[in-house]
């Protein structure tokens, strides 16, 4: 348990100024030049290319000694030789300690994503269980993002499924409400959760404040890892209720005890000897790594997640795990213990850095015996199986991409395929979308939505596609070089017209070297009979059972799915807009308060000035502004009366 999940992490303040060589030298000579002014202090260094791209970020106890190692070029592996050859300048930031440098290095790597560093690819936020404290009947719910002041949190959980499962089971055992304060205050009869024994219905006084407070106390005790003592007490209460012939209460307590058993038995890993810890294991194969992280809180498994950090093939498991660990905890507090399956190169330094981030001591352990060792081995087995599955998938994916290259005559296997589609209804809520596929499947972090800004004639899909292409490729690099995030293949959902529209836009923008393919549905829009339009071939079809055809259909269908969901979300947002959105001085909070009080925007518009002034959270001046917005003739009359006096 913790008072708040982190919203901002501890990052050492930047100290010192960037040091850049006065002359534009490159490679070893550029590093020699930088060494003239680099101190022996601890800190972080950044190696930059001629275009200003950050190639690598590193930390050191002694910056001068560490950077000096790069001038011994023959002792470096090929990857680092290439990095040094591209370096034209260096920047440094001095820190107080090496641990501070390690934290700052991780922060820079996550922000700048240097191509020669080990990178944590998946950096999603994690859900937490939150117990509010601002109401006499506290609410338990799940929460992500910015913490709510004064609330108590448990977590993190690996994913939404894990937190939902625990939330449901906690509701079954403790009957705490999950509804918002507004819903609680507006209820006149119990909701369905009360009927299915998931809530005690404090909204209609089916439970006293004292009894509800007792349930809250028990929930705290359970979620904080003291379930054994709680279960023993409840068993005693159940037996006493039975002896007193209070069978209804005994049955209620029995159901709660069963809920505990459900929580504890819902995972294969529920270690009794581990209270709060993360289990972090790595498995390497074929130059790739998988890291499995299990979240153990209160001796319960809060789920696990697999990560596949990007790194060079020669990186060792220990180096990858160490770099991953520091980046992983950049925006979340580490637990008191982290269990690993290999020795880190600098475990004490990592412990010191994570202890700074947590504000308390953090211990990194590699268990040698007992239950902890068994749990770590189980997590490592999960990492191995996940990596083997991914390698098998990547092998199949590579064959498909080889087939795509062969079908369309590409010079090499495409690493980035961008697929585009549009969606609108008679010109309303028009959106264009881009989805990205490659060797590792769909890259959803690279997906893009384009809300069409220009006027759209109903049915003018060509005009929509032109705007999307102009916005996607309109910004070129200053030196004319191809940006790194440009695609190796453009796949357009449409026929010859869409193909010609896209080709014309790219020609107008001076964009060359990007193959364009349009995929059009066949007769009667039958899947498997699609026509393909390219710049180098006459329109053609692929055999109905060709795996490459299936893959291209998947790309098109994913773009279509994303376009439809984006369009629907845009339409829904438009439908949710209200007359109150246009009233000056009315933000989201006041809008919500007005709708809760009056029931609808129409009722607000029809309300008298006195009724508006009596609404909760609405001041006299705000009420006047609202009334005046809906009654401009009243404003004119009032102004005229004031002038006459």
Curated annotation (Swiss-Prot):
Annotated region described as Disordered, given as residue ranges: 1-20
Family to which the UniProt record says this protein belongs: Belongs to the UvrC family.
Main location: cytoplasm
CDD domains: GIY-YIG_UvrC_Cho
Domain GIY-YIG: 40-118
Gene Ontology cellular component annotations, sorted alphabetically: cytoplasm; excinuclease repair complex
Subcellular location: Cytoplasm
Alphabetized HAMAP family for the sequence: UvrC
InterPro entries linked: GIY-YIG_endonuc, GIY-YIG_endonuc_sf, GIY-YIG_UvrC_Cho, Hlx-hairpin-Hlx_DNA-bd_motif, RuvA_2-like, UVR_dom, UVR_dom_sf, UvrABC_protein_C
Organism: Gluconobacter oxydans (strain 621H)
NCBIfam families named among the record's database cross-references: PRK00558.1-5, uvrC
GO biological process entries: nucleotide-excision repair; SOS response
Function, as annotated: The UvrABC repair system catalyzes the recognition and processing of DNA lesions. UvrC both incises the 5' and 3' sides of the lesion. The N-terminal half is responsible for the 3' incision and the C-terminal half is responsible for the 5' incision.
Name this polypeptide is given: UvrABC system protein C
């Amino acid at each position: 348990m913790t008072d708040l999940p982190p919203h901002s992490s501890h990052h050492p303040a930047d100290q010192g100024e960037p040091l850049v060589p006065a002359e534009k030298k490159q490679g070893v000579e550029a590093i020699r030049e930088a060494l003239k002014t680099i101190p022996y202090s601890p800190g972080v260094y950044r190696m930059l290319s001629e275009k200003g791209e950050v190639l690598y970020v590193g930390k050191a106890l002694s910056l001068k000694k560490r950077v000096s190692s790069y001038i011994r070029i023959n002792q470096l592996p090929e990857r680092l030789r290439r990095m040094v050859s591209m370096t034209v300048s260096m920047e440094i930031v001095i820190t107080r300690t090496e641990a501070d440098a390690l934290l700052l290095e991780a922060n820079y790597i996550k922000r700048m994503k240097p191509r020669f560093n080990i990178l944590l690819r998946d950096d999603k936020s994690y859900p937490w269980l939150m117990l509010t404290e601002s109401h006499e009947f506290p609410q338990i719910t799940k929460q992500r993002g910015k913490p709510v002041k004064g609330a108590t949190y448990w977590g993190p959980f690996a994913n939404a499924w894990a937190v939902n499962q625990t939330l449901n089971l906690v509701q079954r055992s403790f009957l705490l409400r999950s509804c918002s304060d507004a819903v609680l205050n507006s209820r006149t009869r119990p909701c369905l959760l009360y009927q299915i024994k998931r809530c005690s219905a404090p909204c209609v006084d089916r439970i006293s404040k004292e009894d509800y407070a007792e349930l809250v106390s028990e929930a705290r005790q359970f979620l904080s890892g003291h379930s054994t003592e709680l279960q023993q007490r409840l068993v005693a209460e159940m037996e006493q209720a039975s002896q007193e012939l209070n069978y209804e209460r005994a049955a209620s307590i029995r159901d709660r005890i069963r809920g505990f058993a459900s929580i504890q038995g819902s995972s294969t890993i529920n270690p009794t000897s581990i209270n709060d810890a993360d289990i972090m294991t790595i498995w390497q194969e074929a130059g790739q790594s998988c890291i499995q992280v299990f979240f153990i809180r209160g001796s319960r498994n809060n789920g696990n997640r697999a990560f596949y950090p990007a790194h060079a093939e020669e990186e060792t498991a220990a180096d990858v795990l160490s770099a991953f660990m520091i980046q992983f905890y950049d925006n979340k507090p580490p637990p008191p213990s982290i269990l690993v399956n290999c020795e880190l190169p600098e475990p004490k330094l990592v412990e010191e850095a994570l202890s700074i981030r947590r504000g308390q001591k953090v211990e990194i352990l590699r268990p040698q015996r007992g239950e902890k060792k068994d749990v770590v081995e189980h997590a490592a087995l999960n990492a191995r199986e996940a990596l083997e599955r991914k390698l098998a998938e990547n092998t199949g994916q590579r064959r498909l991409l080889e087939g795509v290259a062969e079908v369309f005559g590409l010079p090499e296997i495409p690493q980035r395929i961008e697929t585009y589609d549009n969606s609108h209804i008679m010109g309303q809520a028009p959106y264009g979308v881009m989805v990205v596929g490659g060797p590792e499947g769909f890259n959803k972090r690279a997906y893009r939505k384009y809300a069409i800004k220009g006027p759209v004639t109903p049915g003018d899909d060509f005009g929509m596609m032109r705007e999307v292409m102009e916005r996607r490729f309109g910004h070129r690099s200053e030196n004319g070089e191809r940006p790194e995030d440009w695609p190796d293949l453009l796949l357009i959902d449409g026929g010859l017209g869409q193909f010609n529209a896209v080709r014309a836009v790219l020609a107008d923008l001076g964009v060359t070297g990007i193959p364009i393919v349009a995929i059009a549905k066949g007769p009667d829009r039958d899947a498997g009979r699609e026509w393909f339009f390219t710049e180098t071939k006459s329109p053609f079809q692929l055999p109905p059972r060709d795996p490459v055809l299936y893959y291209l259909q998947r790309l098109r269908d994913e773009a279509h799915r994303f376009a439809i969901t984006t369009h629907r979300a845009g339409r829904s947002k438009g439908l949710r807009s209200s007359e109150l959105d246009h009233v000056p001085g009315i933000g989201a909070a006041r809008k919500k308060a007005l709708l809760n009080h009056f029931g609808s925007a129409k009722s607000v518009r029809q309300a008298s000035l006195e009724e508006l002034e009596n609404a909760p959270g609405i001041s006299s001046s705000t009420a006047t502004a609202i009334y005046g917005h809906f009654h401009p003739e009243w404003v004119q009359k009032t102004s005229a009366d004031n002038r006459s006096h």
